[in-house]
Amino acid sequence: SAASDVYKRQAEVEEEKRKICKSKVDSYDLSRLWEASDDIRSLKSLILFGIKGMAAYAYHALVLGKTDSEVNSFFYTALRAIEGESDPDKLLSLVLKTGEVNFRCMALLDSANTENYGNPVPTVVPLTIEKGPFIVVSGHDLHDLKLLLEQTEGKGINIYTHSEMLPAHGYPELKKYKHLKGNFGTGWQNQQSEFHNIPAPILFTTNCIMPVRQSYSDRVFTTSVVSYPELVHIGDDKDFSPVIAKALECGGYDEDKEMTGMNGGHT
């Protein structure tokens, strides 16, 4: 039943938390947030959703060797407020602080990205998928993309970004790879229809994955902080051999496939 699936997933999350959490903490019952008054619920939701996005950027910066003590400490400040603060004025102040620290975190990630991959430049990105084996990379972890580009170089496999990975084409140290060919499809919200019967593997590097449909489930791989039940996960060794093997097995399209972007264009 749906209820049993929810309880099973909650148990899996608790087990994962025990594995990765370095301190003993009690779980917060999120239903408490939704039971609060409209104003308190809205303010706390803004804070919660703000730090969720910030956590992803902070993680990517950390992978590239960049950290910020103010950003890190704010996670604790925000979570404590979500758990126990009930003063709307204090929460509003914290909402504004969330935006401020988010901006600081984005600057941190920008610094990490540009130091490793160069300053991005305006780039025309093709939306045509060339015939032959290819891999689609979704999410926004540039480090994972770089490692995949290195491992696929010279193997006759083209690489296409998807959704949030699109900006990768502007970075000199990534665009220098000739087999980084273009972008596949439109936004992450359309992935279930656009990936239908795709003759290639998809690698998800962050949590933009949607419930995977049977028409492409055998071609989906995850890595880093994203995973999905019954899918192959590429671990910390970052050995993308299973993804590469799947790309060669699938073979790609027999002829070039022209796709359109969000604005209806072809680049």
State what each model feature region is:
Residues P133-V136, I157-Y160, A200-L203:
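Structural motif
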Residues T206-T267:
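Active-site cores of enzymes that catalyze phosphoryl transfer or operate on phosphate-rich substrates
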Residues H179-Q214, R219-V220:
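Phosphate/diphosphate-binding loops
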Residues Y57-H140, L147, T152-G154, C250-T267:
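A charged, amphipathic alpha-helical module
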Residues A2-Y7:
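Short, small-residue-biased leader/transition segments that mark boundaries at the very start
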Residues D144-L147, A168-Y171, P211-S215:
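Short helix/loop capping segments that flank catalytic or ligand/cofactor-binding pockets
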Residues K19-S23, A36-D39, L43-L46, N102, ...:
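Solvent-exposed alpha-helices and their adjacent loops that cap or buttress functional pockets
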Residues T161-H179:
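Short connector loops at secondary-structure junctions
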